[in-house]
């Protein structure tokens, strides 16, 4: 473990430590690997041009903007795509780590080590996670104690075709959870030949306080009857050790995840009896264990076990009148075990609880029925239109059987939501298209509400496009937060509901332009503005006591810049800058920022490829992050967290066809983000918003066929 030291520039800042002595042979190897992509980049200048087939073209098709496939340049939304090739070059522990390079997206870490995904300045609660257009979000009530299940459960990377990220509201097609944006994982389907992949990987830390981890995954696509029946099988296993980040007081920091694992198996059966109809059945089961070595700064180790079930069946039709898509889905997340152990061996506050499938400690369950029809219409001299209509019904429940002395203990809370939507994308000519639509949602608690959307796209030439639009959003509170009394108590902190809570309402506006510069580069510049009414939050009404509230009004505005080039002498560049300013503009907290997300984010990545070799170097910088409650509950006294930049390098080698060896050195400059300062008389606070692992080496081997 690195010994704590005191930086020379400050008397009250302490680091998790830098070793004064020479590192082991492995550490020397890490430093040697640091130079590899730099040498590769230099040599690329003198290499022959890369085969464009190795790179994605500037034209990309997406489905998340409207529910049907179209060119991303004409899609009525701001979108980014992460490809399977990009996923293969970096460690992917969850969905957050898979899309961490996307501009406009901020990835945070909980104290259990899970990712949180925030888009355009709003918390992860406003981001809808989907797999093939099916929602994976569960009740926010399951996100207690730093566990965020929505980003943990994902298909094996070898099964993923691409991940689409829609920045901005998408409630019209996808529902109220998509107020901030959408992350849609698109998987491989219906193979007509035997295909698959197998991956084994490991991540090795340079410093002892961070945990090593390893895992394996596979995907098999089996054409049982060619072009008629296929079977897809998938599985994934990841395991990690415990992290032991220490404060100068000799105590474990709160963001020190315990050891854990993530296991997933699934299968998909697809039947295409004729060219017009496709039927499918998909099942998935995941087990997860995780926790914190010092939960809520209470010197207690907390470990939790979860089971997640997902079963869905659906139909896709291609007919003369249009395309139909429908499915029914059952999604359930159970907390099945919990263990709390005191870090102080003299104390006897050990506790262990168990649940079963029929009687879990806590459970979130939802049933969804969804149907959609996409119809192309010819309008003669007025152009053409694609009309999308549909609806969905969602019944969700939550029950907490844990002994929390709350008014909802053992009570099954439920909510039913029905929705219908219609949206028309009118292609007036080759240059202009307009999208207008609306969604009507009904809740058995809050009644009916309508959310409209309008979007305009102008593409005066092939290389230039302009987009702009306005959309409304609507989000109902968690049912448990509507109770009149205590709904949760955890490690000395109490949370009270509020029966007067109102649903959130929002209006979002955006304008952007994309230019392709001579077929060499693509540049997108855009701005956005979102105004919330009755934004849901909580306020501290007494020490360690919180109550659910509505803020009066909250605004988020910003600018996004994205740059992407084609290969030039084997090298290409992608990068982005995001400015986000979020502020409470009405109520008791007027003038404050609603969260700790960065105001400025800068990302840059350079890729190189030649023959069997690829290499990359990338950086991510975050600036101006506010502290929610300076000096309170272990947070730092200053109003802001420190800025930081993280640099990663990596690459791959394909020695023979179908065999790929990939590597990465993460945090290559070994930026130490576990640096502490005094907070109050007895506690310490990290001066950075996230605990980012020190320098580490990731190695991966993949066989595909």
Q: What kind of region is each of these model predictions?
A:
Residues 209-241, 245-289, 307-314, 319, ...:
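Transmembrane beta-barrel wall of Gram-negative outer-membrane proteins
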């Amino acid at each position: 473990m690195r010994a704590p030291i005191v930086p020379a520039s400050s008397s009250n800042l302490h680091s998790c430590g830098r070793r004064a002595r020479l590192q082991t042979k492995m550490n020397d190897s890490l430093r040697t690997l640091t130079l590899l992509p730099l040498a590769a980049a230099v040599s690329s200048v003198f290499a022959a041009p890369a085969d464009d087939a190795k790179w994605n073209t500037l034209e990309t098709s997406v489905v998340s903007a409207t529910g049907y496939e179209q060119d991303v340049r004409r899609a009525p939304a701001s979108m980014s795509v992460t490809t399977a090739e990009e996923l293969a070059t970096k460690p992917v522990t969850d969905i957050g780590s898979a899309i961490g390079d996307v501009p406009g997206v901020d990835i945070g870490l909980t104290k259990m080590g899970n990712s949180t995904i925030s888009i355009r300045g709003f918390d992860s609660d406003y981001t809808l996670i989907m797999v093939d257009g099916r929602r994976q979000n569960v009740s926010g009530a399951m996100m207690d104690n730093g566990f965020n299940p929505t980003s943990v459960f994902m298909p094996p990377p070898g099964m993923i075709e691409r991940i689409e990220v829609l920045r901005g509201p998408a409630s019209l097609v996808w529902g109220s959870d998509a107020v901030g944006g959408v992350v849609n994982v698109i998987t491989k389907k219906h193979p007509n030949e035997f295909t698959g992949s197998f991956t084994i990987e490991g991540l090795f830390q340079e410093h002892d306080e961070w945990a090593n981890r390893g895992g394996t995954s596979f995907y098999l696509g089996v054409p049982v009857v060619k072009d008629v029946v296929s079977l897809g099988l998938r599985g994934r296993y990841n395991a990690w050790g415990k992290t032991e980040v220490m404060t100068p007081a000799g105590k474990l920091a709160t963001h020190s995840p315990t050891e854990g694992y993530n296991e997933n198996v699934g299968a998909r059966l697809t039947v295409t009896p004729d060219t017009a109809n496709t039927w499918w059945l998909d099942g998935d089961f995941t087990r997860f264990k995780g926790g914190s070595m010092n939960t809520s700064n209470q010197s207690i180790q907390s470990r939790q076990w979860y089971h997640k079930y997902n079963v869905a069946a659906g139909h896709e039709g291609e007919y003369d009148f249009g395309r139909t898509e429908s499915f029914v889905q059952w999604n359930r997340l159970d907390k099945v075990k919990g263990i709390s152990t005191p870090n102080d061996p003299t104390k006897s506050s050990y506790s262990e609880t168990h649940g079963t499938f029929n009687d879990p400690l806590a459970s979130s369950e939802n049933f969804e029925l969804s149907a959609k029809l996409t119809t192309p219409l010819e309008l003669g001299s007025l152009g053409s239109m694609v009309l999308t209509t549909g609806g969905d019904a969602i019944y969700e429940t939550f029950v907490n059987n844990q002994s929390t002395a709350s008014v909802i203990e053992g009570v099954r809370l439920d909510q039913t939501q029905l929705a219908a939507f219609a949206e028309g994308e009118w292609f007036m000519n080759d240059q202009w298209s307009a999208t207008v639509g609306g969604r009507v949602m009904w809740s058995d608690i809050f009644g009916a509400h309508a959310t409209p959307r309008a979007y305009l796209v102008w593409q005066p030439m092939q290389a230039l496009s302009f987009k702009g639009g306005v959309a409304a959003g609507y989000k109902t509170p968690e049912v448990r937060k509507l109770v009149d009394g205590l709904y949760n108590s955890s490690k000395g902190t109490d949370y009270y509901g509020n029966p007067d809570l109102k649903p959130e309402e929002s209006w979002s506006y955006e304008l952007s332009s994309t230019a392709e510069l001579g077929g060499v580069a693509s540049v997108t510049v855009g701005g956005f503005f979102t105004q919330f009414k009755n934004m849901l939050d909580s306020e501290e009404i007494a020490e360690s006591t919180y109550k659910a509230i509505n803020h009066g009004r909250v605004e988020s505005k910003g600018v996004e810049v994205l740059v992407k080039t084609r290969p030039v002498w084997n090298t290409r560049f992608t990068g982005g800058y995001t400015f986000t300013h979020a502020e409470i503009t009405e109520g008791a907290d007027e003038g404050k920022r609603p969260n700790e997300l960065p105001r400025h984010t800068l990302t840059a990545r350079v890729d190189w490829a030649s023959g069997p070799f690829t290499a990359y170097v990338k950086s991510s910088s975050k600036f101006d992050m506010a502290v929610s409650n300076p000096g309170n509950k272990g947070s730092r006294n200053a109003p802001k967290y420190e800025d930081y930049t993280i640099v990663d390098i990596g690459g791959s080698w394909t020695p023979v066809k179908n065999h790929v060896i990939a590597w990465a050195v993460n945090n290559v400059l070994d930026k130490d983000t576990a640096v502490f300062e005094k907070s109050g008389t007895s506690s310490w606070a990290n001066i950075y918003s996230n605990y980012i692992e020190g320098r580490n080496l990731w190695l991966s081997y993949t066989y595909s066929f």
